[in-house]
Amino acid sequence: MEEFDIDPAFLERDRLRKSGIPVKIAETERLLLRETISSDIPDLYEIWKQGGMVRGTVPVLDTLDEETEFMEAYIRHAYLFYDFGLWTVIEKQSGQIIGQAGLFVSELLDDAVELGYLIGQSYRGKGYAQECGRAILAYAEEVLDLEELHVLIERTNDTSLHVAQKLGFGPYGQDQIHGAETAEDT
């Protein structure tokens, strides 16, 4: 992000956040993506414990209370500071929280913006990661005017590598990070 324009849409997102109302990021045929709110944390905590996505190198904390404290600070600061973050993914038909996906500044990628997605185990294999990924890519381009995004995936995570490929990401490099061999896509 080289320059930053304050437009009416930005001001409306800022107003909603300061009023404690989660900003709706995107809506697809089957999914709603919106900013995470405190009441989402218990459901998300259960999904995070299942594994599958590293939240910007922050491990899942030991207790729900610790996670709640961490996430409430994240909610108060990240969305306001960056105008993006990791968002709650809701299956519209059931109203269930099925995962979390979004954009974050990755210390592992020298502060480049990274796309991440985690769908709960019982909802995997239904195309939800790809569906919310496409919505996030459109939001990143149309709303945030981001010119470059990355995904960082463990080389053994074939499912996530496949999703990234379907989203148009291609191999960029390989690295060893925290002892895990990774493939970086851009």
What spans do the regions from the language model cover?
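Conserved GNAT-fold acetyl-CoA-binding loop/helix
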Residues: G52-A73, F84-G85
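Short loop/turn motifs at secondary-structure junctions and domain boundaries
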Residues: H77-D83
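A generic secondary-structure signal
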Residues: A73-H77, Y139
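Acyl-donor (CoA/ACP) binding surface of acyl/acetyltransferases
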Residues: M1-G56, L86-T186
